[in-house]
Amino acid sequence: MTVELPEGYRPSADEPFMNDMQKEFFRRKLVAWREELLHESAETLDNLKQGGMTVPDIFDRASAEADKALELRTRDRMRKVISKIDAALDRIEDGSYGYCEETGEPVGLERLIARPIATMTIEAQERHERMEKTYNDE
């Protein structure tokens, strides 16, 4: 089903939560973000391939290795975000997008606009992070 969005459309609290227009808005936002990350990832891969030259100076080599490690961490982070974007797109398809995976409550439009891969309300996310911190400190 294709939904036409008016130019400049932005989801509003005045309309039913996760109506077809809102779902299409977030679907487009997620797809565009995914494409941007894939493009950046391809550039990162090109940079890594070009960085395969032997550097004679030990300091230059250390710097090149540090750059390569940073590129690899960035690429890994992008891969994780792309995975979360794919999961969000799946939730749009199955109708669970925009609802907290812990409480079932709406995550909130402003939160989704700021972080379209959010899966929890702010309150549930804070509880989750407190629990994580408690168990990770042991």
Q: What spans do the regions from the language model cover?
A:
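Short Cys/His-rich "knuckle" micro-motifs
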Residues: E110-A114
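Short cysteine-rich clusters marking metal-coordination/redox-active sites
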Residues: C100-T103, T121
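Residues immediately within or flanking Cys/His clusters that coordinate Zn2+
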Residues: Y97, A118
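Short functional micro-motifs and their immediate structural scaffolds
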Residues: V107-G108, E129
